[in-house]
Each structure stands twice: as structure tokens, then as C-alpha cells.
């Protein structure tokens, strides 16, 4: 698979910036039952304690917690589906990005700063302050230029690699569900 060049990636910035700001669409749900395993789901349950039910987050160790337990602010990894489509080319390859939820919505720090809440189906999640930066697997699957692109100054402002979130209110999410930014008082 040919990876995109930086010029090709940057040429898509206008399209990426056109993602909906207040109401988007959940386009893909992926459960990661074990390391490097992916299950594409039509529907999933989100839980404030377990995250996405059946996902391996609950068993993953974190270097960011004192006891190495799963980080509560990283229950969910969410990526803008326009970015995923750009780097993955084919929707069959989207799950390789390693995120659980792929949504067509502006995930930028300006639009969804840490603490922002998002309703998806009957669930509510909260955006974490912890950055989602990717790993060596992202480079292997989508190329070094894609990693540089999502972690560039603009990429970080727009959260092109995605965001981390935690479940505030459990509920059911389905592919095709509206993703709605909840106004803060």
C-alpha cells in the first residue's frame, strides 16, 4: 500500500476542516478484544467503569497511572473519520488506526476543548486533556508522513490523530448515530 506524501496530506486540510462542529455522525465502531485484534460492530455499549464493553482498555496497563492501571481518561480513543479515510484509503483499513469510535466531527481543541461533553446515542462522553498522539503501529500502517502530519502544529490543534475520552453516562451507540456536542452552561 502506497502511503501519502506530506503534500498530499496537507492538500486535504480544507476538507478536514469542514467537519461538522456541533452535530456529526458515528461512522464506525471497533472493539479491540486483545492486542492487534479488531471487531467491527454495528452497536456497542459504553460504560462509565468499563469503557466500551468487551474492549481491552480495561486490561491495558498505563504508564500514566501510579499503579499502572488503565487510565480512566483514556477509556475511548476517537478519530475524525475524514482523517481516517485520508490515511487509510480503504474503509476496510480504518480499524487499523486502533481507535474505537470514528466520527465525522470537528475534534479540534477549539471546538472540543478538554471537558467538553458529547452525546452519542444514549451515552455521554467527556473529552480528556490527555493528547492522543499515535504509536509505531500507526507509522507502520499509514506511513511516517501521516504520523508527522497528525502530530504537526496544525495536526495537534485540529486533533487529527484523535482525542481521548471517558464515559460519563453509559448507553448504547450505533453506527449512524448522531454525535452531538452538548452546550456548556
Model-found features: residue ranges?
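Metal-cofactor-dependent catalytic cores
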Residues: 1-185
Amino acid at each position: 500500500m502506497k502511503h501519502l506524501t506530506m503534500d498530499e496530506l496537507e492538500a486535504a486540510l480544507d476538507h478536514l476542516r469542514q467537519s461538522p462542529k456541533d452535530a456529526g455522525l458515528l461512522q464506525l465502531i471497533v472493539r479491540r478484544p486483545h492486542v492487534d485484534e479488531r471487531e467491527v460492530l454495528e452497536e456497542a455499549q459504553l460504560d462509565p467503569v468499563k469503557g466500551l464493553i468487551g474492549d481491552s482498555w480495561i486490561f491495558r496497563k498505563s504508564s500514566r497511572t501510579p499503579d499502572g492501571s488503565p487510565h480512566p481518561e483514556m477509556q475511548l480513543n476517537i478519530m475524525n473519520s475524514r482523517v481516517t479515510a485520508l490515511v487509510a484509503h480503504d474503509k476496510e483499513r480504518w480499524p487499523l488506526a486502533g481507535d474505537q469510535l470514528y466520527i465525522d466531527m470537528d475534534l479540534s481543541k477549539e471546538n472540543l476543548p478538554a471537558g467538553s461533553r458529547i452525546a452519542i446515542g444514549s451515552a455521554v462522553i467527556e473529552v480528556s486533556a490527555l493528547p492522543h498522539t499515535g504509536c509505531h503501529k500507526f507509522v507502520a500502517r499509514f506511513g511516517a508522513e501521516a504520523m508527522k502530519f497528525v502530530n504537526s502544529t496544525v495536526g495537534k490543534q485540529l486533533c487529527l490523530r484523535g482525542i481521548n475520552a471517558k464515559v460519563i453516562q453509559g448507553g448504547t451507540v450505533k453506527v449512524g448515530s448522531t454525535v452531538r456536542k452538548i452546550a456548556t452552561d
